[in-house]
């Protein structure tokens, strides 16, 4: 009895303390609300002006788009209407190339080989971990919900798919990592094309003769060899920045400059100044971003031919992708950030709000890169050496949303075709989806191109990608937002894990600057004295 009474007393005391704490917090909140002045409201609005304007732009753009849909605007009218949004995309894409090069060069040059190696390893481990988790989530969700019930005969098809083999796509990825011409890499990527070529294939006579029907064997063989054709790979190219090649070159170049010490100081200062100038241009463009996002979203809604597709045949598929992306973006990534850093992930994500909304509007992680830099460095205070290293690489190869989408879409197409996948084929899909997402450049709808590789790996019809193109414009924006969130949280995690190396580097740089300043003075005095002595000697000789 005494024990139970003691436990009840302790529980009662805890409840009372909890209630007192709640009452105190409530009173403090009331006091804060009562003490809010116009100046406080103005300062809050000024601090969060970008975010508030961007959120307002998304809401107004959505309403405006649905309001204008009944007017059935022509293609030309839609393009004119979307022109302010097109300007935003062009301005952001204009800054991507110099930003990737300058940020990676300065980021690598600011770190020693040991620190950059550790940071790079942590970033790669994070990228691979989150991508594999995303693929697993996509596979589990699509198997549980099973959105591919029914038949594909009544489903709407849209667009055409370019055929590509997995081997050629992988080789193209490796080739693009090492561009032969850096200038060309700024506007072109290598891509294998296919041509039909005729070949003379030797055929044994016993394979073509059937009794006495064919009298002239040589003539029959000649006829057969003329129609024998094969698709052969030939070198080609497509327009677009070869981001992967520029990332590899910039990392190597920055690493070399960092090891050159004093000799590389001029180059370090040049790229540092270039990076700072680009970020100042970004600050100017950010004021225009809300207007551009408004017209991008409104224009895309007006441009859609049939809104019923999302709510009709592909409704369950769309819901499945959204659920998978939400689980990864709202649960997995914040939880991973909290487990590593022991910090509130939602405060960190709050500082990224404008970058996430820009990703939603532009559907391009590369175009969002300038805004992501601004949000991480200014709002969340992430070390510039980390953002300059992690973000450009992440925007190029870390695509969690794309990997999740490709694995999920491949299994959806298998379900639509009543194709039963075994465990080995599901593993194959997960591996190829992970690899294909690395090869997907940060450009709109790149996932559709790389998904051909995933479908080919398990023998699924690649033409069935046309079944899901109708909703890809919408899902592309969601997975791009997930990609940007993954890159940004990765920068926060890598900074936390690399804090000791960064501090040690700061100490080393401080000591080296002091030593350099001390060494310069006596050197200048000696050189001046030696010049005076030389001139005196020459005068006496004269």
From Swiss-Prot:
Binding site for L-aspartate: 363-365, 402, 443-447, 476, 483
GO MF annotation, one: high-affinity L-glutamate transmembrane transporter activity
Residue numbers of Phosphoserine PTMs: 512
Cytoplasmic side: 1-47, 109-122, 261-269, 341-345, 377-385, 495-542
Intramembrane runs of residues: 346-376, 426-459
Quaternary structure (record): Homotrimer.
Protein name: Excitatory amino acid transporter 1
Organism in which the protein naturally occurs: Bos taurus
């Amino acid at each position: 009895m005494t024990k139970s009474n003691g436990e009840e007393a302790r529980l009662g005391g805890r409840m009372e303390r909890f209630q007192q704490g709640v009452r105190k917090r409530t009173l403090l909140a009331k006091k804060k609300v009562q003490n809010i002045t116009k100046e406080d409201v103005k300062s809050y609005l000024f601090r969060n002006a970008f975010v508030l304007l961007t959120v307002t732009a998304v809401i107004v753009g959505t309403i405006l788009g649905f309001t204008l849909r009944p007017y059935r605007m022509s293609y030309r009218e839609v393009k004119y209407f979307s022109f302010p949004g097109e300007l935003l995309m062009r301005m952001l894409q204009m800054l991507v190339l110099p930003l990737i090069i300058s940020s990676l060069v300065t980021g690598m040059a600011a770190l020693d080989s040991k620190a950059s190696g550790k940071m790079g390893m942590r970033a790669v481990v994070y990228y691979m971990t989150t991508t594999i988790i995303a693929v697993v989530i996509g596979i589990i969700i699509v198997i549980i919900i099973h959105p591919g019930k029914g038949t594909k005969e009544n489903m709407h098809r849209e667009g055409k798919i370019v055929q590509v083999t997995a081997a050629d796509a992988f080789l193209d990825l490796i080739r693009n990592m090492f561009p032969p011409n850096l200038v060309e890499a700024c506007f072109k990527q290598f891509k294998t094309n296919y041509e039909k070529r005729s070949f003379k294939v030797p055929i044994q006579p016993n394979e073509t003769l059937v009794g006495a029907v064919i009298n002239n064997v040589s003539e029959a063989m000649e006829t057969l060899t003329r129609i024998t054709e094969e698709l052969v790979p030939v070198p080609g190219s497509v327009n677009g920045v070869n981001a992967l090649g520029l990332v590899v070159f910039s990392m190597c170049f920055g690493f070399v400059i960092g090891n050159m010490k004093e000799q590389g100081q001029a180059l370090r200062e040049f790229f540092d100044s270039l990076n700072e100038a680009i970020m100042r241009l970004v600050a100017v463009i950010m004021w225009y971003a809300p207007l551009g996002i408004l017209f991008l979203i409104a224009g895309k809604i007006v441009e859609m031919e049939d809104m019923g597709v999302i709510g009709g045949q592909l409704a369950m598929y769309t819901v499945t992708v959204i659920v998978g992306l939400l689980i990864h973006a709202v649960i997995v990534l914040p939880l991973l950030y909290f487990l590593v850093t022991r910090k509130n992930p939602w405060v960190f994500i709050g500082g990224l709000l404008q970058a996430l909304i820009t990703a939603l509007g532009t559907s391009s992680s590369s175009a969002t890169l300038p805004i992501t830099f601004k949000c991480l460095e200014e709002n969340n205070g992430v070390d510039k050496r980390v953002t300059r290293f992690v973000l450009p690489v992440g925007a190029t190869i870390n695509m969690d949303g794309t990997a999740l989408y490709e694995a999920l879409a491949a299994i959806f197409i298998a379900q639509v075709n009543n194709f039963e996948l075994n465990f080995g084929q599901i593993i194959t899909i997960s591996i190829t989806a992970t690899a294909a997402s690395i090869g997907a450049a940060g450009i709109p709808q790149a996932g559709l191109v790389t998904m051909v590789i995933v479908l080919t790996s398990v023998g699924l019809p690649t033409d069935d990608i046309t079944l899901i193109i109708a909703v890809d414009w919408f899902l592309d924006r969601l997975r791009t937002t997930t990609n940007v969130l993954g890159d940004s949280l990765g920068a926060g995690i890598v900074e936390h894990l690399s804090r000791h190396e960064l501090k040690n580097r700061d100490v080393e740089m401080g000591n080296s600057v002091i030593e350099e300043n001390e060494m310069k003075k006596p050197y200048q005095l000696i050189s001046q004295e030696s010049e005076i002595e030389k001139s005196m000697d020459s005068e006496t000789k004269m």
